Amino acid sequence: MHIFIFNNASRAANYGIGTYVRLLSDGLLGRSGVKVSFVDMFSDVKEYSIADDERGCRHYQVPALFSGMENEPYCRNVFYFLARHIKAEDDERLVFHFNYFQHKPLASLLKGQYFDCRIVFTVHYLGWCFELKGNKTRFRELIAEGYQPKDDKERGLLAGVENEKEFLHLADEVIVLSKDTQQILAEGYGVSSDKMHLVYNGLGDGLCFDKDKNVGNGRIILFVGRLDEIKGLNYLIHAFRHIADKYADIRLVVAGDGDFQLYLSQCRDLQGRVSFLGKVSSSEVEDVYRSAYIGVMPSFHEQCSYTAIEMMRHKIPLIGTDTTGLAEMLDATPELRVSIDEDNMMDEEFTERLVSCLNLLLSDEDAYQRAADAVGKLYEARYKVSDMVHATCGVMESSWDRPDYTVSPDYLKHIDSRMIQLINQCPDIDTDFYGMGGIGVYLWKRVLDLCDRKEGDFQASLILEHLIYYMDWVQDVVGSSPLPVELWAMIRSMGQHGFYKTCVNALLVRQSGSDTLFQMPSDRVIINVVLNVFR
């Protein structure tokens, strides 16, 4: 199995996604029969290049374009670069592992080029979570049937959801990092449950903590993360201010980069009690965690935070919110889970809840120790890197176990829409099976399949309506020229089912060899053809 991992040399690559890619690839390299290569998008190189790293992994390096980092032309150029160099052996199983929604055009092209490959997508984020600060109630309102967006912001958000949905439907396997995301994708994105796999992020393979933590220099309350509004640091600063006089030995340490000025101004009355470390290097981060007494993540959105896992691994009691994926990371310590009221968020009430959790851990040593032990046990049960690698590799390997598999059933409606769009456009394309013929053969085969399932009635009716336009298009273009055998087989099948008799019968009469029988191509051949029509 040859796994191509797609990554970005971007800000996110220096945070959670970059950590995930590094740990996953390190683990996969130790597995028998697995080869790992990287496609490094937006790389700091001047031209397309190929290089091997010290581990023997091949890197396909793609330079940045100032005109747009990941727009469709950029992805198409990357595809042509990869198609020249990736040559699949007859028995080699190819996995293209994506981590960014912006790469959807590239994934679609690769699926058409390497039909037997598997597209695996790991969901590290959902765009609307940043815009709506993880508010699932508001998200459900926006995607409700019949909802009309009120402004450009809402229209842009919904367009982003549709883009994410198409990629998730295209993917053969979808890896989610939390149960919460699994539910959102099932209910809000229509992703089939049989291709979704819950695999928690993993870090290390054992606890890493001091049994006798030295708090002689004071008890440190630690925040680690980007200095973005969605991380909720301002609430933590307000909460710290409430308790600073009560506990003279506590300090707040903030590790991460971003807009320092905004938060420094909030700490003017806390001089000497709050420290901003900036972005901490990998060589220093261990000391930061070892010195921490309590961790706080007042975030409005997380998937499966490596910061939270690192705190668990060091047996640091963690105070967090009940938002998205963070809630289940606090399963072992529900008393430290701070509720976010999505319908009526009150800043003061939220701050008071943070204060209550901080007071519990700072004033009750037994409660503190119970929480420390609980998070350590949860880490060992759920968040070890060996478990993550084993489960992810299992998802990829088992993807070939489905008999007669061609493409994700979720994706068929998107193919339908693309074929219908081509019918409406009537482009100047060849009439053979790899052009006009493939469009009709695919849609007619879809109708036959949908008619066998009651839930497919609406979609079948939509396709049949456009097949009428399609047959008129064929009649205009083909004239008396011989029909491709695949198109001929489709028209014969239409005649047998009594579809659009006037046009179909006219074509049957006009075509020579009407007594010759041809078989419709197999599903595998048809899907392969229409995926390439997408190009």
Each language-model region and where it sits:
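Membrane-proximal helix-turn-helix segments that form the acceptor-binding/catalytic region
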Residues: 127, 142-174
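Conserved donor-binding/catalytic core segment of Leloir-type glycosyltransferases
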Residues: 175, 214-231, 237-240, 253
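Carbohydrate-associated surface elements
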Residues: 180, 202
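Nucleotide-activated donor-binding/catalytic signature segment of Leloir-type glycosyltransferases, i.e.
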Residues: 264-283
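Short alpha-helical donor nucleotide-sugar binding micro-motif in glycosyltransferases
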Residues: 279, 287-292
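Aromatic "clamp/platform" in nucleotide-sugar-dependent glycosyltransferases that forms part
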Residues: 300
